[in-house]
Amino acid sequence: MTINITPISNESFNLNETSSTTINLLNHFDDPLTTGKVANFNLEDNSLGSGEINIVLFDQTGEGAPIAVNNFASYVDGGSYNNSIIDRSFSTSQSKYILGGAYTVENLEVKRITPNAPIEDEFSSQRSNKAGTIAMYKLTDEANSARNRWVFNVGDNPDFDTRGGGLTVFGQVLSPEDLNTLNAIASLPVTNTSLPVINPVTSSQFSTLFSRLPVNDNTIANDFNFPYPSYPFTEDNQFVRFENITIDNVLEFTFTVESNTDPDVVSASFDNQGNLILDYGSSLKTPLYRFQNQDLPGTYLFVGEQERQSILSNFRNFKEEGLAFKTASQANGDTIKTGETDITIKATNLLGESAQQSFKVSVTGDVPENENQDQLIRFNRFQNRDIPGTYLYAAEEESRNIRQNYTNFIEEGIAFYTYGADANLGQDIYRFQNTSQPGTYLFVGEEEKNSILANYPQFVLEGVAFEVAV
């Protein structure tokens, strides 16, 4: 895959005219396959692999398959795939796939998913049926005949590239963990059986032969000899069933600063809309990004750019929620200076492919004096040893109390410098404690504070923690 690039121009700024500038990086990097749509297949049995399958949907016009994605989304939005099952698992040395999208099971009642009109094929050899992809399935070799059925290519299936003009690949697994889940399903035992199936349109019932139906129970697998057993199931979870399938819109790239030759001239950060923020006129220009620990929902970590890159690469349980606020990295505030710096931005798409761009920034003007540098105070980071992966940020006075009285909090060092709660020099950041996870904290601005107070009673407001730039 090629990431399309539109060059970022060199920039020049005057300190006496502006203190920061925003550049929309989505105008300079484009993934030709996706706009950032991700489908989540949520398995009822979360012991199968990771319990879910995440798929990047190829909805971009041009190189993607927007007709197939829109067709798939119409079934998702209508709830048609809720409680849907994998109805066939096939594996040989030449082919390996699992098939779904045709039937639902609820209270042991099997129903046919009502198909919409067939869609136009969008097969491309650049989107072939390789391991980890999903395609619209056709029951025959007739072109333009795909409807509601889809197939996960667990292995490479070159035959699907020629069936009826080719099965249209419209997505790919987000990560190796998702492919592992596909393999876990494909490794389950299978059975051949006849099941009564209800047509919801006519309410009629008809017997249907299921060949190589994967089962979550070894006791009902069989050796494929006739006569096939009739309805050996006693529980819904003996089927491989998806509780639901949803589609989210996410940012199609993760952006990082690969290099910045003089961050004292310009600090580079990113918001969660794909904007690059260049700061050059503030003594609080060190960005802190917020991550939520998905293993402990409602617990958070705030980190700078270097630690952010390490988390993005190595700790998938921490989900980035975007730029939180800006502080200073040194006691007398971040340096404001004129000069030039060369910045390189790396864009990594949802499938892990990346591209880089470099550009130059020049800053001129008269450097203002930092009259408030003596108002900056130090905040330290503590990790709660009783709940690993959860953190507290405290000023020095509170830090002394924590060191003396709360040995479960392990000090990890200086987190940042910023203004105290009563300085009236920045924007207030409020501290909440999560009573569902006592000893865990969240730091938010005014707007999010009001939302939490209105909607999340488990978070208790403890007051203004500090003031920052945002």
Set out the residue ranges of the language-model regions.
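Solvent-exposed strand-loop boundary residues in beta-sheet-rich modules
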Residues: 45-47, 261, 295, 351
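Cyclophilin-like peptidyl-prolyl cis-trans isomerases
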Residues: 2-20, 25-251, 271-282, 330-343
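C-terminal edge beta-strand
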Residues: 353-365
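Short, solvent-exposed loop/linker segments at beta-strand-coil boundaries, enriched for Pro/Gly
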Residues: 251-270
